[in-house]
Structures are given as C-alpha cells and as structure tokens.
C-alpha cells in the first residue's frame, strides 16, 4: 500500500518532534465552504504527517479510554479551557444512545479496530449552575455546549492531554448544541472531534474526515492512517 510505504519514511520525523507537556490541545471544526480539500496536493505522505505529526509529535491512547456522556447541556464560555457551567437542559435517552453509537463506531474506524469498544460508558447529570471539568484521567468526556457556533463560529472542539512520551491521558469532545441536535451531519462532527481526542490533527492537503471543515466520511486514506497510527509496529514503537 502506497500510504504504508510512505509512512516508513516519516515515522522518524514524527518521533523527533517535541511534545507539549501541559495544557489541553483543542482543535475546532467549522462549516463546509463547499470546496473540498485537494486530494492531489502534496501526496499521502504529507497528509499523513499533518494528521499524525504536528508540534506535539505523534500521540495515541495505549488502552481503550472510558467514555463519559454529559447528560446536562453545558454553557460554552469563550476563553474557557476545561471547566464549564451546566444548564438545566438535558439530552434525551435517544440522544444519548445515538451519541454513544456514533462515537463507538468512530472509535473502531479511527483506531483500525484496535479499540472496538470504550472500556466503559457512563452518563453524568450535572446540577444546573454547577461547574464540570471535561479533562479527566483515562476518559473521553463528550457533551453538547450552548453557544459554540454563536460565539466562536465553530461546530465543535475536540482535544486531548498527553504526556511527553505521546501517551494520551484525557480527551474531550465539545459539540455545538444546536448543530448536534438538528443537523443530519452530526455524525461527521462527532467522528471528527473524536479523531482529535484520539490523537489526530487537521489534514489540509487532501480529503479526510480530519479536514478542518465538515463534509466527508472517513475514507481509504483515513483508514490507512489509523492502521499506521495504531497497528504499524515501527510507528507505535516510535513513542
């Protein structure tokens, strides 16, 4: 496979990029411009470096994370990091079931079936006005947030915290409440933000689920990249 061959040449480059030890690394997804990324760009090797490299170096979970669903809709405040206030709105049982299903399906695809399930799935109801941290050891915390689209022009944020060796220790998925509640494209949003929580960065040079604008399903490139990130021994051992 051409992409697997290209990966051998850039594994060493990715492994030498210094990791950022502190802070939660969030990435945003915006609405589609109607112009998909150019699949002919600099080649799959360059796109792979965008997706798996970056200033932090390659990052991944070493074991299946726990998934925590915030039943309470949270209030997004611009400039916030990992603490947010709960509203009195709640996700329905059907909303939660769909969200868990989409994230579980995405987990399998984006880890090349290394993790087919989260190690556990839990729900959390937060009293209105109470503060919640979305950065928690060994967990990916996911929920709907009021005001993301309105205040910062984004559909969602996905992020993670990692140690210097590239091991991800916490992840978070912040979904714009209105978009996630009403859009037929919400599964793409959820999958994209999960990708960030799993260690992936934005891809600009070709079409990918990790493009910074919403629009495409996981494709052959994404599946091959997941195989490299989670299954290729040389890459896994590079951190």
Question: For each predicted feature, which ranges?
Answer:
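Disordered inhibitory propeptide/activation segment of secreted metzincin zinc metalloprotease zymogens
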Residues: 16-95, 107, 155-165, 236
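Positively charged n-region of N-terminal signal peptides that target proteins for export
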Residues: 1-5, 100
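Bacterial N-terminal signal peptides
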Residues: 6-15
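Active-site recognition of the HExxH zinc-binding catalytic motif
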Residues: 188-200
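Metalloprotease/metallohydrolase-associated module, dominated by Zn2+-dependent proteases
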Residues: 20-25, 157-185, 201-239
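Metzincin-family zinc-dependent endopeptidase catalytic domain
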Residues: 97-191
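A generic secondary-structure signal marking the coil-to-beta-strand transition
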Residues: 63-65, 130, 171, 206
């Amino acid at each position: 496979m051409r992409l697997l061959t290209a990966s051998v040449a850039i594994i060493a480059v990715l492994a030498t990029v210094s990791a950022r030890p502190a802070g939660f690394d969030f990435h945003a997804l915006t609405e589609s411009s109607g112009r998909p990324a150019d699949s002919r760009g600099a080649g799959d090797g360059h796109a792979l470096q965008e997706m798996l490299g970056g200033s932090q170096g390659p990052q991944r979970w070493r074991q299946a994370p726990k998934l925590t669903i915030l039943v309470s809709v949270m209030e997004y405040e611009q400039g916030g990091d990992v603490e947010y206030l709960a509203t009195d709105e709640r996700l329905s049982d059907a909303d939660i079931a769909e969200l868990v299903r989409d994230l579980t399906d995405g987990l399998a695809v984006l880890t090349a079936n290394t993790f087919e399930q989260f190690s556990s799935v839990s729900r959390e109801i937060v009293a209105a006005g109470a503060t919640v941290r979305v950065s928690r050891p060994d967990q990916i915390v996911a929920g709907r947030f009021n005001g993301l689209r309105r205040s910062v022009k984004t559909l969602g944020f996905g992020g993670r915290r990692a140690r210097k060796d590239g091991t991800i220790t916490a992840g978070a998925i912040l979904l714009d409440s209105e978009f996630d509640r009403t859009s037929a494209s919400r599964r793409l949003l959820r999958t994209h933000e999960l990708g960030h929580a799993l260690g992936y960065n934005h891809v600009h040079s070709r079409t990918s689920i990790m493009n910074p604008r919403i629009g495409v399903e996981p494709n052959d490139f994404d599946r091959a990249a997941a195989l490299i990130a989670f299954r290729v021994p040389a890459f896994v051992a590079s951190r």
